[in-house]
Amino acid sequence: MKWKHLPLLVMISLLTLSKKHLLLAQLIPDPEDLERGNDNGTPAPTSDNDDNSLGYTGSRLRQEDFPPRIVEHPSDLIVSKGEPATLNCKAEGRPTPTIEWYKGGERVETDKDDPRSHRMLLPSGSLFFLRIVHGRKSRPDEGVYICVARNYLGEAVSHNASLEVAILRDDFRQNPSDVMVAVGEPAVMECQPPRGHPEPTISWKKDGSPLDDKDERITIRGGKLMITYTRKSDAGKYVCVGTNMVGERESKVADVTVLERPSFVKRPSNLAVTVDDSAEFKCEARGDPVPTFGWRKDDGELPKSRYEIRDDHTLKIRKVTAGDMGSYTCVAENMVGKAEASATLTVQEPPHFVVKPRDQVVALGRTVTFQCEATGNPQPAIFWRREGSQNLLFSYQPPQSSSRFSVSQTGDLTVTNVQRSDVGYYICQTLNVAGSIITKAYLEVTDVIADRPPPVIRQGPVNQTVAVDGTLTLSCVATGSPVPTILWRKDGVLVSTQDSRIKQLESGVLQIRYAKLGDTGRYTCTASTPSGEATWSAYIEVQEFGVPVQPPRPTDPNLIPSAPSKPEVTDVSKNTVTLLWQPNLNSGATPTSYIIEAFSHASGSSWQTVAENVKTETFAIKGLKPNAIYLFLVRAANAYGISDPSQISDPVKTQDVPPTTQGVDHKQVQRELGNVVLHLHNPTILSSSSVEVHWTVDQQSQYIQGYKILYRPSGASHGESEWLVFEVRTPTKNSVVIPDLRKGVNYEIKARPFFNEFQGADSEIKFAKTLEERPSAPPRSVTVSKNDGNGTAILVTWQPPPEDTQNGMVQEYKVWCLGNETRYHINKTVDGSTFSVVIPFLVPGIRYSVEVAASTGAGPGVKSEPQFIQLDSHGNPVSPEDQVSLAQQISDVVKQPAFIAGIGAACWIILMVFSIWLYRHRKKRNGLSSTYAGIRKVPSFTFTPTVTYQRGGEAVSSGGRPGLLNISEPATQPWLADTWPNTGNSHNDCSINCCTASNGNSDSNLTTYSRPADCIANYNNQLDNKQTNLMLPESTVYGDVDLSNKINEMKTFNSPNLKDGRFVNPSGQPTPYATTQLIQANLINNMNNGGGDSSEKHWKPPGQQKQEVAPIQYNIMEQNKLNKDYRANDTILPTIPYNHSYDQNTGGSYNSSDRGSSTSGSQGHKKGARTPKAPKQGGMNWADLLPPPPAHPPPHSNSEEYSMSVDESYDQEMPCPVPPARMYLQQDELEEEEAERGPTPPVRGAASSPAAVSYSHQSTATLTPSPQEELQPMLQDCPEDLGHMPHPPDRRRQPVSPPPPPRPISPPHTYGYISGPLVSDMDTDAPEEEEDEADMEVAKMQTRRLLLRGLEQTPASSVGDLESSVTGSMINGWGSASEEDNISSGRSSVSSSDGSFFTDADFAQAVAAAAEYAGLKVARRQMQDAAGRRHFHASQCPRPTSPVSTDSNMSAAVIQKARPTKKQKHQPGHLRREAYTDDLPPPPVPPPAIKSPSVQSKAQLEARPIMGPKLASIEARADRSSDRKGGSYKGREALDGRQVTDLRTSPGDPREAQEQPNEGKARGTKTAKRDLPPAKTHLIPEDILPYCRPTFPTSNNPRDPSSSSSMSSRGSGSRQREQANVGRRNMAEMQVLGGFERGDENNEELEETES
């Protein structure tokens, strides 16, 4: 946009406008654009590539300018005090924006404001500080800054940038302290630097030099310096250094002293002395500092007054006693540690007997054992000898198989297989270094006794309580060999059976009758055999009288467990035997516990209970004697009792003492173990819980049985804990892994050899620290509270985790204070010795969660449970119930980026779905742009415009669409909403019931059509199909017609290229169809180039006798002839169906051309959607409006290719000729109807131009010759030909390919009319109807005069609202043209807002006959033509109503007529037909210029039936019923059933027609139009034109009245009623029907109901 065209004042004012005003200002049109506009001030249209699609261009003020944008944002700065600083900010914009700085919301003063200011605003927009001013009280430069860039288009704000002044205080918050550690121990120094900003970093210096932190032993973490393994070289002076950008600060000096633990130079040795001797232990150690020495006794105190410690640290004990024996430890200790060395003092003591042997009596052959046990120090050796014998038996001697004598390790003498010679004394002697003692015992041998186990009591007595005088029964069942003897004892006294009350049965049961109180006591059953005895006891209580006694409940044997299996021995040791058994689950109850009994001769002669209440099936019996034979049995028990005993186990012998320990010299063992020296290596750390220990033995000994590894935690925190022992019993091993250690703990470890109870000297102590792990428990007692010192700070406190879960040394604690957004997060880290932290600067209103975790060297551990806190605006904590409010939770969720992204994505998806739906909806609307206006609102009708095409070298105006019509395709036609199948070619009935044969076919065969064009199309299609054996669908009835692809075929044309009623393309050739002239041009080019498929066969009748064909058929054939004239090289050009493209050379199909039209008549209805049901009509039927056939057929030329004779076209067995599959409509039809009905109104939105069809809301006229002159000859021809149609033989063609899909056309005489009533006009009153009648009659006369003069007529009446009709503002105007001008009449002056479609008068005269034929009384006026013949002005042929027509703006004059009442009864069908036939005028005479080879005879026309008013009235009622039902499908069927399209028949042979006078009406001549007399003012019923009712052939018998399976239920009653004889209707019937009034319909309804 050029600025020079705008006033300067506007430019200045625009600089101050906001963005919103600028957008409005951009819509100001440019003056040059206004000058280029139309004269009336409308904006000039822009070119296709213009960005402005509104048709005008707006002002673009300073198009190159744009608002500011920050390209470089300032960043945070930390500057030292007094130092210069720069905050960068760069912005771009046009004009160049100005930059200002703000701090804390206030504008920053720079040198531009005050030259003395230390702040400078650089040209780039950066803010430069000459120096940073910062004091204790005044801090002018510190704060948060933003830069703002502005120009007249707006402003841009940068990000926040904080400028902070760096500080570093002098005093350290914590100075490192002196450290004193031992070599090998870790050293830790802690330092907290001075407060500063930014937080200073920490480094260390040693002896004035930076500390080398590359040493892997040295770790600097936070303020801590850790040396893991100190050396002597680590000693020195250490300084902590804190550094930030201000400088550095040094802490106080800390001394690190590395000391040495004590280590022994000479360890004490084990000693063995005799009683009353002295014992000395020497000890010598070194260390730094020099250690101090001490002695202690491990298991007691040093003997008082008998020990001394010499200056050389030697321990001396005088007069040693046996109590002094033990382990003595030398302790060397200094300030960094201590060392210990132990030695054992052994005091030798003379032996003494502990167990002396006793005399034994044993049976011959048995085994006997003498026990002898002695103690002493050292342990005395025991040996046996038989008195009088020198053979000694020692315990350490290996057993000899030939000897029956042996001595156990404990000193017991055992004699097996005793013989009588073994009788005598046996001497036990014990001996050690301190002395010896002797004892003896006598062995007596008796007779042989069976070596059997003692008896076993299977079931013994149970405790009982009985009343006085009650009966007691005590059972005792025992087994043994021999049978055991059972005795009963009471409280240890044998029960006497002399008392008559007491009786012992043979089975051993003891029975006591008449019990007394004295019978109370413990009863014992003893079962005895020579091998031993068994006992079982029970307590019996006798109660006095009056005391309730619970009698013993008899025990069910099934409730007691069964005996377990025989126990098996699984393991045997010196004093332990392990048994295994299984319960008996096959019988008895499940046991809950077990009882184990054992027997051994070494322990006595009876069974002993060794274990009770055993819960498992395996048990280890301990405490057994070594080298003894044992027998075992097991009993099962539960709450109900004890089971029988199991089988006795096999004998098992416990192990003897190992022979290696026999005969050992204790002093020698102790001496050798004391000389063993172990060297322990540094332990290897394997994991956090295991350490591997290695050692070497300097001096091996045969008495090393194993090693004991002793370990314990070390450190002050653990104190002097006890040593833990891990034994290694393999002398050859020199390493072991100690498991189950604590994590991160320092251990001290040592090793010690041992032999039985003897132990050697300890090795040196080694230290090992297990690996650390993260703490496995969170800190305890975490609390969050308000800090008193700061308004927005909180105090977090905690306690360390439990020690066993720390898994190392806690080095620090991490504190997380998390807000609901990351910008509010605050994290803190404190030292491991700190248990609280203050977190400042919390944002009020933000809910924080605080978590604490302890951190070791392995990292942070488990976090504590979140503690929530929220501060209000005053800094006070909010109560917990308020913290987690629903609003806060919702706010937290809404602020989450994921939620925002999800909402955005959902909105985008919804928008895309809606856009797709809207696009598809609009696309369907555009696709339905070929639908007629109001197709979804009111059943209406649209007629076909006049189209010119070439015929025989001259332009001929066709009243129909110049397109192929074919209904022979399957039921997939896009123009049918409820596509019902057509009849197949197997049907013999004629396609249109125009002359119902005498076979009696009634209305059941009636085929309903949506429009007269459908009837005409089907008439010709069926004729062609009869000739070609085309396969047709099954049904004869169609539903709603989908006209979505046909709107472009219904257009009016107004173009200078219209010549003589023909459209002439720029090349001079007439175009058959205005909207498809480009396609026709391509077709012409294609035909000239030999286009088309030469192999495609064309329709050609067989060479048989020709019959004359109706002019309708001739019109189609003539057009086919025209198309064939375009062929080149005899190549046949297939005609194009309306809804299919011919091929790629056709230039596009009619369908594609129509879609592009975007006419406004589509109303956005979907393709294929069923149209709504027709509203009520006042008895009107569109069949009344169907015009007669043309009176002047075109001349015959090459008729064998384009048409067929009557012989070829008609089947002898058919009631009427079959329509051809392809047909064109003829101009003459329009001419003869135009004169009768007035000018043809166009469909809205259609226009024509020489090059293409233009679509707009401007009105165009239709060049249509007035067809009024053509009406009277049809009136004359029709009655003679009706009902007398001959039946020529069947002539069929053989098709090569199926015909293209059908394209319905509107007949020329109906183009542009509205056939359906307005929805708003359905329920009008009778007075309004009378007024409309008067208006219609006045308009008729006026329109008649206009038509005679060939003038334009502008409609003036409003025809309904926009909801249910197409208003005049949305459609084109129309007008008629005089033929003498040969040019288009001017555009109609229809206003875009007048809301009219056509005049009431013109429409009224077109529907007058329809109204009266339907049973309405209409004021009729007769008119006289040039010849003086009287005729009616309205059309006489009935025309069916179309439910899908776009003529939704029917004139109110027609709609609002009241239904006539019936005045007289119906006459019989034949009478009616005769009466009507007699009153018909003679047929017309065709002009000589047009000759038809196939004109039907008058007799043929007479043979055709007509459509009676009964059908019309019935259909009208069906229409009203369907409207009341709200458009239900049933109503729809009723609507479809009554839409009968009657095809007009041909007027007869043209030769006869030429001979008959035309009474001054010469069709196609201008004179005839000028000379028409004024219209008659009244019409008479006799002038109603008869019309044929169409029908389809059915799949049944041609004469089967039920072949129409898809007929409407509304029409079925009428068809059944007339089935007997309605094949043809005579003229008398029509005459009677024409006189119907309102009452006729009522009677008809009664008749229909009765039928």
From Swiss-Prot:
PTM comment: Ubiquitinated. May be deubiquitinated by USP33.
Gene name in the database record: Robo1
Ranges of biased composition (kind: Basic residues): 1459-1470
Subcellular locations according to the entry: Cell membrane; Cell projection, Axon; Endoplasmic reticulum-Golgi intermediate compartment membrane
The protein's name: Roundabout homolog 1
Gene Ontology biological process terms from the UniProt entry: aorta development; aortic valve morphogenesis; axon guidance; axon midline choice point recognition; cell migration involved in sprouting angiogenesis; cellular response to hypoxia; chemorepulsion involved in postnatal olfactory bulb interneuron migration; coronary vasculature development
Record field: compositional bias (Polar residues): 39-56, 1255-1269, 1438-1451, 1592-1601
Residue numbers bearing the Phosphothreonine modification: 948, 1240
Species whose genome carries this gene: Rattus norvegicus
Glycosylation-annotated residues: 160, 463, 790, 820, 827
Biased composition (Acidic residues): 1322-1336, 1642-1651
Tissue specificity: Expressed in embryonal brain and spinal cord.
Residue(s) carrying Phosphoserine: 940, 1055, 1297
Modified positions (Phosphotyrosine) in chain numbering: 1038, 1073, 1114
Stretches assigned to the Ig-like C2-type domain: 68-164, 170-257, 262-346, 351-446, 455-541
Transmembrane segments: 898-918
Annotated S-S bridges: 89-147, 191-240, 283-330, 372-428, 476-525
GO cellular component: axolemma; axon; cell surface; cytoplasm; dendrite; endoplasmic reticulum-Golgi intermediate compartment membrane; neuronal cell body; plasma membrane
Lineage per the UniProt record: Eukaryota, Metazoa, Chordata, Craniata, Vertebrata
Signal peptide annotation: 1-25
Domain Fibronectin type-III: 563-657, 676-773, 778-874
Its job: Receptor for SLIT1 and SLIT2 that mediates cellular responses to molecular guidance cues in cellular migration, including axonal navigation at the ventral midline of the neural tube and projection of axons to different regions during neuronal development. Interaction with the intracellular domain of FLRT3 mediates axon attraction towards cells expressing NTN1. In axon growth cones, the silencing of the attractive effect of NTN1 by SLIT2 may require the formation of a ROBO1-DCC complex.
